A protein has these predicted regions:
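Long amphipathic alpha-helical segments
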Residues: 141-169, 230-314, 318, 322-359, ...
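Structured, contiguous alpha/beta core segments that scaffold functional sites
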Residues: 1-57, 61-65, 69-257, 264-266, ...
Length: 378
Protein backbone atom coordinates (compact mmCIF):
# COMPACT_ATOMS: atom_id res chain seq x y z
CA UNK A 1 0.00 0.00 0.00
CA UNK A 2 1.42 3.28 -1.08
CA UNK A 3 1.44 6.06 1.39
CA UNK A 4 0.06 9.34 0.25
CA UNK A 5 2.85 11.83 -0.01
CA UNK A 6 2.47 14.50 2.61
CA UNK A 7 2.05 17.91 1.01
CA UNK A 8 4.57 20.50 2.06
CA UNK A 9 2.89 23.48 3.66
CA UNK A 10 4.48 26.78 2.85
CA UNK A 11 3.74 29.77 5.02
CA UNK A 12 2.38 32.60 2.96
CA UNK A 13 4.07 35.94 3.32
CA UNK A 14 1.58 38.53 4.48
CA UNK A 15 2.67 42.13 4.42
CA UNK A 16 0.21 44.72 5.64
CA UNK A 17 2.05 47.88 6.51
CA UNK A 18 -0.91 50.23 6.33
CA UNK A 19 -0.81 52.33 9.43
CA UNK A 20 -3.79 53.81 11.20
CA UNK A 21 -2.69 57.39 10.81
CA UNK A 22 -5.24 60.10 11.28
CA UNK A 23 -5.02 63.85 11.54
CA UNK A 24 -2.81 65.09 14.41
CA UNK A 25 -5.58 66.92 16.27
CA UNK A 26 -6.61 64.18 18.66
CA UNK A 27 -8.90 66.26 20.85
CA UNK A 28 -11.38 66.60 17.98
CA UNK A 29 -11.74 62.82 17.77
CA UNK A 30 -12.69 62.63 21.45
CA UNK A 31 -15.15 65.50 21.40
CA UNK A 32 -18.31 64.96 23.45
CA UNK A 33 -21.13 67.47 22.80
CA UNK A 34 -22.04 69.65 25.78
CA UNK A 35 -19.13 68.22 27.74
CA UNK A 36 -16.50 70.00 29.79
CA UNK A 37 -12.86 70.69 29.15
CA UNK A 38 -13.44 72.02 25.65
CA UNK A 39 -10.72 74.68 25.82
CA UNK A 40 -8.16 72.35 24.25
CA UNK A 41 -10.60 71.53 21.46
CA UNK A 42 -11.12 75.22 20.69
CA UNK A 43 -7.36 75.79 20.52
CA UNK A 44 -6.95 72.87 18.14
CA UNK A 45 -9.80 74.17 15.98
CA UNK A 46 -7.88 77.38 15.36
CA UNK A 47 -4.68 75.48 14.68
CA UNK A 48 -6.28 72.89 12.41
CA UNK A 49 -8.50 75.19 10.31
CA UNK A 50 -6.75 78.44 9.30
CA UNK A 51 -10.05 79.99 8.22
CA UNK A 52 -11.30 79.99 11.81
CA UNK A 53 -8.04 81.47 13.10
CA UNK A 54 -8.25 84.21 10.47
CA UNK A 55 -11.89 84.88 11.41
CA UNK A 56 -11.00 85.50 15.06
CA UNK A 57 -8.13 87.79 14.07
CA UNK A 58 -10.31 89.84 11.73
CA UNK A 59 -13.11 90.18 14.29
CA UNK A 60 -10.60 91.37 16.89
CA UNK A 61 -9.15 93.99 14.54
CA UNK A 62 -12.56 95.16 13.32
CA UNK A 63 -13.92 95.55 16.87
CA UNK A 64 -10.83 97.39 18.13
CA UNK A 65 -10.27 101.14 18.22
CA UNK A 66 -11.63 103.68 20.72
CA UNK A 67 -10.99 107.02 22.40
CA UNK A 68 -11.56 108.03 26.02
CA UNK A 69 -12.91 111.42 27.03
CA UNK A 70 -12.31 112.81 30.53
CA UNK A 71 -13.86 115.71 32.40
CA UNK A 72 -10.76 117.95 32.52
CA UNK A 73 -7.74 118.52 30.31
CA UNK A 74 -5.06 117.38 32.78
CA UNK A 75 -6.79 114.07 33.39
CA UNK A 76 -7.19 113.66 29.64
CA UNK A 77 -3.46 114.10 29.00
CA UNK A 78 -2.41 111.69 31.75
CA UNK A 79 -4.95 109.07 30.74
CA UNK A 80 -3.99 109.25 27.06
CA UNK A 81 -0.32 108.80 27.94
CA UNK A 82 -1.12 105.89 30.23
CA UNK A 83 -3.31 104.11 27.68
CA UNK A 84 -0.69 104.43 24.95
CA UNK A 85 2.27 103.22 27.07
CA UNK A 86 0.76 100.91 29.70
CA UNK A 87 2.77 97.66 29.89
CA UNK A 88 0.98 94.48 28.92
CA UNK A 89 2.18 90.91 28.94
CA UNK A 90 4.90 89.49 26.70
CA UNK A 91 6.66 92.74 25.95
CA UNK A 92 3.63 94.56 24.56
CA UNK A 93 2.51 98.06 25.43
CA UNK A 94 -0.69 100.01 25.03
CA UNK A 95 -4.31 99.38 25.89
CA UNK A 96 -5.04 98.32 22.31
CA UNK A 97 -2.67 95.36 22.60
CA UNK A 98 -4.29 94.38 25.87
CA UNK A 99 -7.73 94.63 24.34
CA UNK A 100 -6.67 92.52 21.35
CA UNK A 101 -5.50 89.67 23.59
CA UNK A 102 -8.56 90.06 25.80
CA UNK A 103 -10.92 89.88 22.82
CA UNK A 104 -9.03 86.91 21.39
CA UNK A 105 -9.61 84.94 24.59
CA UNK A 106 -13.23 86.10 24.79
CA UNK A 107 -14.06 84.90 21.28
CA UNK A 108 -12.12 81.65 21.55
CA UNK A 109 -13.21 80.47 25.00
CA UNK A 110 -16.32 82.57 25.62
CA UNK A 111 -14.65 84.28 28.57
CA UNK A 112 -11.59 86.39 29.28
CA UNK A 113 -9.70 87.38 32.40
CA UNK A 114 -7.29 90.20 33.12
CA UNK A 115 -5.55 91.88 36.02
CA UNK A 116 -4.70 95.44 36.98
CA UNK A 117 -1.24 95.54 38.55
CA UNK A 118 -0.99 98.21 41.26
CA UNK A 119 2.32 99.23 42.80
CA UNK A 120 3.15 102.18 45.02
CA UNK A 121 -0.44 103.34 44.94
CA UNK A 122 -0.41 103.67 41.14
CA UNK A 123 -1.74 101.53 38.31
CA UNK A 124 1.43 100.17 36.71
CA UNK A 125 0.30 97.55 34.20
CA UNK A 126 -2.71 95.77 32.76
CA UNK A 127 -2.35 92.10 31.83
CA UNK A 128 -4.60 89.40 30.46
CA UNK A 129 -4.30 85.84 31.74
CA UNK A 130 -4.89 82.24 30.79
CA UNK A 131 -8.56 81.75 31.45
CA UNK A 132 -8.28 77.98 31.00
CA UNK A 133 -6.26 77.70 34.24
CA UNK A 134 -8.96 79.40 36.33
CA UNK A 135 -12.31 78.40 37.75
CA UNK A 136 -15.31 80.61 38.35
CA UNK A 137 -17.58 80.48 41.38
CA UNK A 138 -20.84 82.32 41.82
CA UNK A 139 -20.98 84.36 44.99
CA UNK A 140 -23.72 84.78 47.53
CA UNK A 141 -25.67 86.95 45.11
CA UNK A 142 -26.00 86.67 41.31
CA UNK A 143 -23.92 89.82 40.82
CA UNK A 144 -20.87 88.45 42.61
CA UNK A 145 -18.28 86.30 40.83
CA UNK A 146 -15.27 84.78 42.58
CA UNK A 147 -12.26 83.71 40.50
CA UNK A 148 -10.25 80.72 41.69
CA UNK A 149 -6.68 79.95 40.65
CA UNK A 150 -3.91 77.50 41.56
CA UNK A 151 -1.63 78.32 44.47
CA UNK A 152 2.04 77.36 44.87
CA UNK A 153 1.12 73.76 45.70
CA UNK A 154 -1.29 73.50 42.77
CA UNK A 155 -4.47 73.62 44.83
CA UNK A 156 -7.34 75.83 43.67
CA UNK A 157 -8.32 78.66 45.97
CA UNK A 158 -9.89 82.12 45.59
CA UNK A 159 -7.43 84.65 44.21
CA UNK A 160 -6.63 87.62 46.43
CA UNK A 161 -7.55 91.17 45.46
CA UNK A 162 -10.63 90.24 43.47
CA UNK A 163 -11.31 93.95 42.94
CA UNK A 164 -8.23 94.18 40.69
CA UNK A 165 -9.30 91.31 38.44
CA UNK A 166 -11.11 91.78 35.15
CA UNK A 167 -13.56 89.13 34.00
CA UNK A 168 -15.91 89.09 31.03
CA UNK A 169 -18.18 86.40 29.60
CA UNK A 170 -19.82 86.30 26.19
CA UNK A 171 -23.43 85.13 25.96
CA UNK A 172 -23.44 83.31 29.33
CA UNK A 173 -26.09 80.66 29.82
CA UNK A 174 -28.49 80.58 32.78
CA UNK A 175 -27.04 78.75 35.73
CA UNK A 176 -23.45 78.86 34.46
CA UNK A 177 -20.84 81.56 35.13
CA UNK A 178 -18.93 80.59 31.97
CA UNK A 179 -19.55 82.14 28.58
CA UNK A 180 -20.12 80.55 25.19
CA UNK A 181 -17.38 80.36 22.57
CA UNK A 182 -18.07 81.16 18.93
CA UNK A 183 -16.62 77.71 18.21
CA UNK A 184 -19.37 75.85 20.02
CA UNK A 185 -21.08 73.52 17.59
CA UNK A 186 -18.06 73.36 15.28
CA UNK A 187 -16.03 70.35 16.54
CA UNK A 188 -18.30 67.76 14.92
CA UNK A 189 -18.08 69.37 11.49
CA UNK A 190 -14.39 70.13 11.96
CA UNK A 191 -13.68 66.45 12.64
CA UNK A 192 -15.31 65.50 9.32
CA UNK A 193 -13.34 68.21 7.53
CA UNK A 194 -10.08 66.96 9.03
CA UNK A 195 -10.85 63.42 7.86
CA UNK A 196 -11.42 64.69 4.32
CA UNK A 197 -8.16 66.65 4.29
CA UNK A 198 -6.23 63.76 5.81
CA UNK A 199 -7.60 61.43 3.14
CA UNK A 200 -6.68 63.88 0.39
CA UNK A 201 -3.13 64.06 1.72
CA UNK A 202 -2.88 60.28 1.93
CA UNK A 203 -4.14 59.84 -1.63
CA UNK A 204 -1.61 62.33 -3.00
CA UNK A 205 1.16 60.73 -0.99
CA UNK A 206 0.33 57.36 -2.52
CA UNK A 207 0.11 58.94 -5.97
CA UNK A 208 3.68 60.17 -5.59
CA UNK A 209 4.86 56.94 -3.99
CA UNK A 210 3.14 54.22 -5.99
CA UNK A 211 2.64 50.75 -4.52
CA UNK A 212 2.93 47.84 -6.94
CA UNK A 213 1.37 44.41 -6.99
CA UNK A 214 3.65 41.80 -8.63
CA UNK A 215 1.86 38.52 -9.40
CA UNK A 216 3.80 35.47 -10.60
CA UNK A 217 1.46 33.03 -12.28
CA UNK A 218 2.68 29.44 -12.14
CA UNK A 219 1.27 26.25 -13.57
CA UNK A 220 -0.67 23.63 -11.69
CA UNK A 221 2.33 21.32 -11.66
CA UNK A 222 4.54 23.87 -9.92
CA UNK A 223 5.80 22.70 -6.58
CA UNK A 224 4.87 25.03 -3.64
CA UNK A 225 8.46 25.28 -2.48
CA UNK A 226 9.61 26.16 -5.97
CA UNK A 227 6.82 28.72 -6.26
CA UNK A 228 7.91 30.35 -3.02
CA UNK A 229 11.53 30.49 -4.11
CA UNK A 230 10.52 31.97 -7.43
CA UNK A 231 8.40 34.59 -5.68
CA UNK A 232 11.29 35.57 -3.43
CA UNK A 233 13.60 35.90 -6.42
CA UNK A 234 11.12 38.10 -8.29
CA UNK A 235 10.56 40.24 -5.19
CA UNK A 236 14.30 40.71 -4.70
CA UNK A 237 14.85 41.71 -8.32
CA UNK A 238 11.89 44.09 -8.24
CA UNK A 239 13.12 45.74 -5.04
CA UNK A 240 16.60 46.11 -6.53
CA UNK A 241 15.14 47.75 -9.64
CA UNK A 242 13.12 50.19 -7.52
CA UNK A 243 16.15 51.09 -5.39
CA UNK A 244 18.24 51.80 -8.46
CA UNK A 245 15.47 54.05 -9.74
CA UNK A 246 15.71 56.15 -6.57
CA UNK A 247 19.41 56.71 -7.29
CA UNK A 248 18.71 57.86 -10.83
CA UNK A 249 19.88 54.65 -12.52
CA UNK A 250 17.67 52.91 -15.06
CA UNK A 251 17.51 49.19 -14.32
CA UNK A 252 15.39 46.75 -16.28
CA UNK A 253 13.32 44.12 -14.56
CA UNK A 254 13.57 40.69 -16.20
CA UNK A 255 11.52 37.72 -15.03
CA UNK A 256 10.88 34.24 -16.36
CA UNK A 257 7.30 33.14 -16.79
CA UNK A 258 4.00 34.96 -16.65
CA UNK A 259 4.47 38.00 -14.39
CA UNK A 260 1.71 40.60 -13.95
CA UNK A 261 2.50 44.02 -12.50
CA UNK A 262 -0.26 46.42 -11.40
CA UNK A 263 -0.45 49.65 -9.47
CA UNK A 264 -2.37 49.11 -6.24
CA UNK A 265 -5.46 51.30 -6.28
CA UNK A 266 -4.65 52.73 -9.69
CA UNK A 267 -8.06 51.89 -11.11
CA UNK A 268 -9.99 53.48 -8.24
CA UNK A 269 -11.05 57.11 -8.82
CA UNK A 270 -10.41 59.75 -6.16
CA UNK A 271 -13.62 61.12 -4.67
CA UNK A 272 -14.51 64.72 -5.41
CA UNK A 273 -14.10 66.69 -2.18
CA UNK A 274 -15.14 70.13 -3.41
CA UNK A 275 -18.84 69.83 -2.55
CA UNK A 276 -18.56 68.37 0.99
CA UNK A 277 -15.69 70.69 1.91
CA UNK A 278 -17.66 73.71 0.74
CA UNK A 279 -20.79 72.61 2.62
CA UNK A 280 -18.83 72.25 5.86
CA UNK A 281 -16.94 75.52 5.42
CA UNK A 282 -20.21 77.35 4.74
CA UNK A 283 -21.53 76.33 8.15
CA UNK A 284 -18.27 77.09 9.93
CA UNK A 285 -17.98 80.54 8.34
CA UNK A 286 -21.66 81.28 9.01
CA UNK A 287 -21.01 80.74 12.73
CA UNK A 288 -18.39 83.51 12.71
CA UNK A 289 -20.73 86.05 11.10
CA UNK A 290 -18.12 87.18 8.56
CA UNK A 291 -18.70 87.23 4.79
CA UNK A 292 -16.83 84.35 3.11
CA UNK A 293 -14.78 86.56 0.78
CA UNK A 294 -13.23 88.34 3.78
CA UNK A 295 -11.64 85.00 4.65
CA UNK A 296 -10.41 84.28 1.13
CA UNK A 297 -13.31 82.00 0.15
CA UNK A 298 -14.52 83.12 -3.27
CA UNK A 299 -17.53 80.96 -4.01
CA UNK A 300 -19.00 83.47 -6.44
CA UNK A 301 -17.24 85.47 -9.15
CA UNK A 302 -19.30 88.59 -8.36
CA UNK A 303 -19.35 88.24 -4.59
CA UNK A 304 -19.16 91.46 -2.61
CA UNK A 305 -20.48 92.81 0.65
CA UNK A 306 -24.02 94.10 0.38
CA UNK A 307 -25.55 96.76 2.57
CA UNK A 308 -27.50 94.13 4.51
CA UNK A 309 -24.37 92.08 5.19
CA UNK A 310 -22.50 95.17 6.33
CA UNK A 311 -25.31 96.10 8.72
CA UNK A 312 -25.43 92.61 10.21
CA UNK A 313 -21.66 92.45 10.65
CA UNK A 314 -21.62 95.93 12.16
CA UNK A 315 -24.24 94.90 14.72
CA UNK A 316 -22.15 91.84 15.62
CA UNK A 317 -19.05 93.98 16.15
CA UNK A 318 -20.95 96.50 18.26
CA UNK A 319 -22.25 93.66 20.42
CA UNK A 320 -18.65 92.59 21.07
CA UNK A 321 -17.72 96.18 21.90
CA UNK A 322 -20.57 96.51 24.39
CA UNK A 323 -19.36 93.33 26.07
CA UNK A 324 -15.83 94.61 26.74
CA UNK A 325 -16.66 98.29 27.33
CA UNK A 326 -17.15 97.87 31.12
CA UNK A 327 -13.61 96.45 31.35
CA UNK A 328 -12.12 99.45 29.54
CA UNK A 329 -14.10 101.84 31.73
CA UNK A 330 -12.93 100.06 34.90
CA UNK A 331 -9.29 100.37 33.85
CA UNK A 332 -9.62 104.08 33.09
CA UNK A 333 -11.54 104.87 36.26
CA UNK A 334 -9.10 102.93 38.43
CA UNK A 335 -6.14 104.81 36.95
CA UNK A 336 -7.75 108.23 37.46
CA UNK A 337 -8.92 107.36 40.98
CA UNK A 338 -5.42 106.31 42.02
CA UNK A 339 -4.08 109.53 40.49
CA UNK A 340 -6.53 111.51 42.65
CA UNK A 341 -8.49 112.88 39.68
CA UNK A 342 -12.08 112.87 38.56
CA UNK A 343 -12.64 109.34 37.29
CA UNK A 344 -15.68 110.02 35.14
CA UNK A 345 -14.91 108.91 31.59
CA UNK A 346 -16.74 108.25 28.35
CA UNK A 347 -15.68 105.60 25.83
CA UNK A 348 -15.96 106.78 22.21
CA UNK A 349 -15.58 103.87 19.81
CA UNK A 350 -14.24 104.38 16.32
CA UNK A 351 -16.70 104.10 13.47
CA UNK A 352 -16.89 100.72 11.77
CA UNK A 353 -16.50 101.39 8.05
CA UNK A 354 -17.28 98.33 5.94
CA UNK A 355 -18.80 100.01 2.91
CA UNK A 356 -17.11 101.82 0.08
CA UNK A 357 -16.42 105.44 1.03
CA UNK A 358 -17.67 106.66 -2.34
CA UNK A 359 -20.97 104.84 -1.83
CA UNK A 360 -21.38 106.34 1.62
CA UNK A 361 -20.67 109.82 0.25
CA UNK A 362 -23.21 109.26 -2.52
CA UNK A 363 -25.80 108.16 0.04
CA UNK A 364 -25.13 111.27 2.16
CA UNK A 365 -25.60 113.41 -0.95
CA UNK A 366 -28.94 111.77 -1.72
CA UNK A 367 -30.13 112.31 1.85
CA UNK A 368 -29.10 115.96 1.77
CA UNK A 369 -30.91 116.47 -1.54
CA UNK A 370 -34.03 114.78 -0.19
CA UNK A 371 -34.04 117.01 2.90
CA UNK A 372 -33.58 120.06 0.67
CA UNK A 373 -36.54 119.10 -1.52
CA UNK A 374 -38.74 118.47 1.52
CA UNK A 375 -37.81 121.85 2.97
CA UNK A 376 -38.59 123.60 -0.32
CA UNK A 377 -41.91 121.80 -0.60
CA UNK A 378 -43.00 123.19 2.74
Amino acid sequence: MKRKKKEQQVASAVCQLRDGRSHPFGALRGYVPLGTGQERIYRELREAIPVLDAAVGKMVRLADGFQVECQNKLAQEKLDQFLSMVPCVRGQYGINNFLSGYLDSLLTYGRAVGEMVVGGGKLRAVCWGDVTALEIEEGENPLETIIWGPDEQGFMKPLPYQQLLLFTTMNPEPGSPYGVSIFRGMPFLAEILMKIYQTIGTNWERAGNVRYSVICKGGNDLDPVTAQERGKAVAAEWSRAMEEGKNGTVRDFVAVGDVEIKVIGGENPILDSEVPVRQILEQLVAKTGLPPFLLGLNWSTTERMSTQQADILTSELWAIRRTVQPVVEKICRTFLALEGMDNRVSIIWDDISLQDISQEAQADLYRAQAEKYRAEAK
